């Protein structure tokens, strides 16, 4: 109960630099009781304290902050006092306090912060505080370059000589209001002769939505393949799935911390882009975003990193690669050094625009069955959506002609090639 109360306060206060709301008098009085409570997660307490110190306070919050400074022994766990009374020596807390004060980190400082972050001996409440502080301050482009690079370096990776490898990079916290047919898109790409790698996780905060891992498990597949076995499957069947547990175990081990800090950190932006199987030829990425800030941030980070040859970033449903069938979708492409932005529509590929509503009651079993029905020949919305996303990938990367691609993909479904590629998945 107490943990849930603090999480609810954090959901209100710790949203971000623009969306956070102030706490009222009753809420600040409740917070006084929850911050020192030993029955509440220290990670959640540290994250809440970070939000309180970072964002502009209202009068009730100002009064609480004064109480924290004057009598910290009454209102804070001993571990968190250093946030108010930092030592002079270089430490993770020193860097966190710099972020809390609204100052940006230098490249050297950002790297030092990530040294602490990936050190298993450093307490998770400090890591959560750092993530929250960066979220609320808003990471600079240079900071994000460091964060992306360090997450990339922390991930296990093997190379392949596959000429072109398409990476479907959905957000790891999944979907809980909309469909996502990524596993079927991957199978259809494979049927068309193009290799595709899916990555993800079983479940992670803040949404704990269903993922490609979920769908594969429901389909009787094995989502936890070792990287070498996944590469073998990629070569023989044209598509495969790799789980974060296999390629970035250090981040996978932080799942509980991410649950207790409640809000989405910068980890979510970059963990999906680490490409654990990497082609020595061409690597093409498709990923999605939700918030407008990340539209530009994602594509520019991909360009600056030089880690992919082409990229497609769409304003997908729930930030995924799944595009709406009932309206235009913003689509940004990267081709070498050239970035272009336009809008795309199902009608661009000869597909009917159909109504699509968010549905909080959606379950992954339904998505799996709809995808299987589509591959069995049923003319349903899933079929059109799978074709739409696959056609767009092939068109925008120059792998197929827009005027011909839809008919080709329809034929691959109708002749059973797509279902064969799906069924052959381990």
PLM feature spans:
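Acidic, glycine/proline-rich low-complexity segments that act as flexible tails and inter-domain linkers
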Residues: 1-178, 196, 353-358, 369-379, ...
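Residue-level signal for inorganic ion chemistry
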Residues: 48, 130, 216, 271, ...
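Alpha-helix C-terminal capping segments
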Residues: 54, 136, 185-195, 218, ...
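A generic, well-ordered mixed alpha/beta core segment in the N-terminal half of proteins
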Residues: 161-232
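General beta-strand structural signal in soluble alpha/beta enzymes
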Residues: 168, 197-200, 224-226, 241-244, ...
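Phosphate/diphosphate-binding glycine-rich loops and adjacent basic-rich segments that engage nucleotide
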Residues: 225-290
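Glycine-rich ThDP/TPP pyrophosphate-binding loop and its adjacent helix/strand module
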Residues: 282-323, 327
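A hydrophobic, small-residue-rich beta->alpha segment in the mid-to-C-terminal subdomain
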Residues: 337-395
């Amino acid at each position: 109960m107490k943990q849930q109360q603090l999480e609810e306060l954090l959901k209100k206060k710790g949203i971000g630099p623009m969306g956070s709301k102030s706490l009222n008098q009753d809420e600040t009085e409740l917070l006084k009781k929850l911050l020192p409570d030993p029955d509440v997660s220290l990670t959640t307490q540290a994250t809440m304290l970070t939000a309180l110190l970072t964002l502009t306070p209202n009068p009730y919050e100002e009064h609480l902050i004064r109480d924290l400074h004057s009598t910290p022994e009454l209102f804070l766990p001993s571990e968190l006092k250093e946030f108010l009374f930092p030592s002079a020596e270089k430490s993770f807390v020193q860097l966190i306090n710099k972020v809390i004060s609204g100052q940006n980190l230098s490249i050297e400082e950002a790297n030092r912060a990530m040294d602490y972050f990936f050190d298993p001996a450093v307490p998770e409440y400090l890591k959560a505080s750092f993530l929250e502080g960066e979220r609320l301050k808003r990471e600079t482009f240079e900071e994000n370059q460091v964060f992306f690079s360090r997450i990339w370096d922390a991930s296990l990776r093997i190379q392949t000589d596959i000429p072109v490898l398409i990476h479907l990079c959905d957000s790891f916290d999944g979907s809980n209001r909309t469909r996502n047919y990524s596993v079927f898109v991957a199978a259809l790409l494979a049927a068309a002769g193009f290799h595709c790698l899916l990555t993800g996780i079983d479940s992670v905060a803040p949404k704990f939505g269903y993922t490609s891992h979920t769908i594969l498990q429901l389909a009787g597949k094995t989502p936890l393949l070792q990287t070498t076995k996944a590469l073998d499957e990629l070569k023989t069947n044209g598509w495969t799935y790799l789980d974060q547990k296999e390629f970035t175990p250090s981040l996978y081990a932080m799942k509980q911390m991410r649950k207790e800090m409640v809000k989405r950190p910068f980890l979510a932006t970059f963990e999906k882009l680490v490409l654990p199987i990497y082609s020595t030829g061409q690597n093409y990425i498709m990923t999605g975003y939700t918030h407008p800030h990340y539209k530009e941030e994602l594509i520019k980070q991909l360009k600056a990193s030089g880690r992919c040859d082409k990229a497609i970033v769409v304003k997908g449903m729930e930030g995924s690669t799944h595009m709406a069938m009932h309206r235009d979708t913003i689509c940004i492409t990267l081709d070498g050094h050239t970035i272009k932005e336009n809008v795309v529509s199902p009608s661009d590929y000869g597909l009917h625009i159909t109504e699509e509503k968010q549905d909080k009651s959606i379950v992954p079993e339904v998505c799996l069955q709809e995808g299987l029905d589509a591959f069995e020949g049923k003319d349903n919305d899933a079929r059109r959506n799978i074709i739409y996303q696959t056609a767009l990938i092939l068109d925008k990367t120059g792998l197929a002609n827009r005027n011909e691609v839809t008919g080709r993909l329809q034929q691959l479904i109708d002749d059973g090639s797509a279902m064969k590629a799906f069924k052959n998945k381990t």
